[in-house]
């Protein structure tokens, strides 16, 4: 390999963030990008290293990456992530944490470059085949993919691991060896260490042939996207939920294709055929009076008002009270529910000096809200306002003392209504 075949989208970008583990692949990628920067002085190049804390050598890997980046004059960002069991397995969870850190580190106008190569593409295809994936899963990885509002580029995707090794040796590059890469208990390592060498011994061009198949699958998926675009428009609401009535009229095959694309739009993991069947049978077709729920990692699919919802799992906060000692400043909510803030200009009265301020998630008794005659219990108000059941004990309720003032984004009580122009608004950043 004498030159790197950069994705054409990369050629038009002047701001690049390179994922840099310090291993062979990412070292070659960063080296190539440094050479690219030398030829194009307007290019701004940064690197990011993710410290997973999984290896006893993780700290020394950070020092290695710092040394390399200092020598090549590449600013390095080191992000430490904490991995907890989320039911996806350590490989999937580490990958999820990595890409979340990448997304948070990207600057406006910056693209992300990662070092996957042809052998990685082959492994990804075979893993998808093992899972029984269809054309979407077998499409494997693209050279250019949307990511976090920008692009994820894989400039080495047409190069083999052997070619990368030859480049690294020829240019005297130093890289680290992750001991976990030799553990064939991991599926990807098993393919790389055992299966692929045997296949390539028999068929030397096997990875390239697999890559062609992946490309053909990707083309078929793009064609399906075009053909199903009008169906998606009919089925998906402005809130991103999936209307069930059009799906009821579709064939099983067409409906499954719509479900997959809706989940992909919600950044959900690609579901198996069995998972799609469960979504339809256990959630969509559940009894009318049921509140069906199907968990997928830290998310779940629910049905409400003849629509499917993809939501993050949040524990109910029914018994939680959060004291708001200084109501002029934002208040952080528990369970990742975001923050609330009282801002000038609105229909809520300000708290009186003697009134304590708090956020709660339940309210007893009969309530009287602005714009409605008569009193209602909170459950009835939620139903009338079309608030899904899972949001009813996670929607912040503003209290002054023991008096309910408002529900964020839903209603204001008569006791909470402003009587002058000095009112405030309850803003919830979920």
UniProtKB/Swiss-Prot annotation:
Which Cys pairs does UniProt list as disulfide-bonded?
A: none
Q: What EC number(s) is this enzyme filed under?
A: 6.3.4.19
Gene Ontology biological process terms in this record: tRNA modification
Report residues binding ATP: 21-26
The cross-references to InterPro entries, in alphabetical order and at most eight, read: Lysidine-tRNA-synth_C (IPR012796), Rossmann-like_a/b/a_fold (IPR014729), TilS/TtcA_N (IPR011063), tRNA_Ile_lys_synt (IPR012094), tRNA_Ile_lys_synt_N (IPR012795), tRNA_Ile_lys_synt_subst-bd (IPR015262)
The cellular component terms of Gene Ontology attached to this UniProt record, alphabetical and capped at eight, are:
cytoplasm
Identify one Pfam family in the record: TilS_C
Domain-level remarks = The N-terminal region contains the highly conserved SGGXDS motif, predicted to be a P-loop motif involved in ATP binding.
Q: What is this protein called?
A: tRNA(Ile)-lysidine synthase
Q: Which organism is it from?
A: Salmonella heidelberg (strain SL476)
């Amino acid at each position: 390999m004498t030159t790197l075949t950069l994705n054409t989208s990369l050629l038009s970008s002047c701001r690049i963030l390179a994922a840099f583990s310090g291993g062979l692949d990412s070292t070659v990628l960063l080296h190539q990008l440094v050479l690219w920067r030398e030829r194009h002085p307007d290019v701004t190049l940064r690197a990011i290293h993710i410290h997973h804390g999984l290896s006893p050598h993780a700290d020394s890997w950070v020092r290695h990456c710092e040394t390399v980046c200092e020598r090549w004059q590449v600013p390095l960002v080191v992000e430490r992530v904490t991995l907890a069991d989320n039911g996806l397995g350590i490989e999937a969870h580490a990958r999820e944490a990595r890409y979340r850190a990448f997304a948070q580190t990207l600057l406006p106008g910056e693209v992300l470059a990662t070092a996957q190569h042809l052998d990685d593409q082959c492994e990804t295809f075979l893993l998808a085949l093992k899972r029984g994936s269809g054309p979407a899963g077998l499409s494997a990885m693209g050279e250019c993919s949307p990511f976090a509002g920008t692009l994820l580029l894989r400039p080495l995707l047409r190069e083999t691991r052997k070619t990368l090794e030859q480049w690294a040796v020829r240019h005297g590059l130093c890289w680290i060896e992750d001991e976990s890469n030799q553990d064939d208990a991991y599926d990807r390592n098993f393919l790389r260490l055992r299966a692929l060498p045997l296949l390539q011994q028999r068929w030397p061009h096997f990875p390239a042939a697999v890559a062609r198949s992946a490309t053909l699958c990707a083309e078929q998926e793009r064609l399906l996207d075009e053909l199903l675009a009008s169906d998606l428009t009919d089925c998906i609401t402005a809130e991103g939920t999936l209307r069930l009535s059009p799906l009821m009229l579709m064939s099983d095959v067409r409906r499954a294709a719509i479900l997959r694309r809706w989940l992909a739009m919600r950044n959900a993991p690609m579901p198996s055929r069995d998972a799609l069947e469960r979504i339809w049978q256990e959630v969509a077709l559940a009894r009318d009076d049921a509140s069906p729920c199907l968990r997928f990692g830290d998310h779940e699919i629910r049905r409400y008002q003849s629509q499917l919802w993809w939501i993050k799992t949040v524990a109910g906060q029914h018994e939680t009270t959060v004291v708001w000692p200084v109501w002029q400043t934002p208040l952080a909510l528990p369970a990742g529910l975001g923050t609330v803030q009282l801002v000038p200009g609105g229909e809520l009265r300000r708290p009186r000096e003697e009134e304590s301020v708090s956020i709660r998630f339940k309210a007893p008794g009969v309530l009287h809200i602005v714009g409605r005659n008569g009193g209602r219990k909170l459950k009835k108000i939620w139903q009338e306002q079309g608030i899904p059941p899972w949001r009813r004990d996670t929607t912040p309720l503003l209290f002054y003392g023991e008096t309910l003032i408002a529900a964020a984004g839903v209603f204001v009580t008569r006791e909470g209504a402003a009587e002058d122009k000095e009112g405030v608004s309850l803003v919830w950043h979920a």
